[in-house]
Amino acid sequence: ENLAKIAAMIGQTDNSRPAAAGLPRLAIEQQNETSEGDVLPKGSFRLRMGDQSIYAKELEVRLFVRYYSYDLWNNANPELSIRTVLAPSLSDDFPDTSGGNKCGKLSKDEVANLSSNSIEHAKQKSIKCTQVVYGVVTSADGSKTIDGEDVDVKGTPFVWSARGSAFMPVANHIREVPSNKIMFGQKAKVTTKRNVNG
């Protein structure tokens, strides 16, 4: 056992995770249940680490960096979906995988001039802007697996694609960081709140 640890420490063996594993992904659980019928805590934060998901109602995090991206998802053929590069400002150029910019996203004024029942108007509504945020969990009281097993996720790095109802709260938090402070030095408590539409 000690020999194996020493071999790993000096680089003799490669104990790294597979490259495809990537960073754990933070999201807000949108589903009510799994495909097997297990109940999921909809509205809780989900931290997907490999093939395991950990849930928490509230997290404390430090956000290190925020980028923006656009995508136009193709449900029929996901491999034909269009995505842009990541950029730190909405005023930056966003070259996309189709050779265009911002997946073809028009300005608000241009969209307002489109007929509401046109194909282009429908396409514009399908182009989504996402904030891609990299951070680390500083505390997560009550974080558990779906089976109720307690898991300590303190110190876990994550990537969070904040879009939809999560977009503005993240943007507002970053905007409110005082100009004499750096975002990654600030801890933030993040919670979810159920909104009823309609």
Where are these regions (language model features)?
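OB-fold ssDNA-binding interfaces and closely related basic DNA-contact patches used
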Residues: 1-151, 196-197
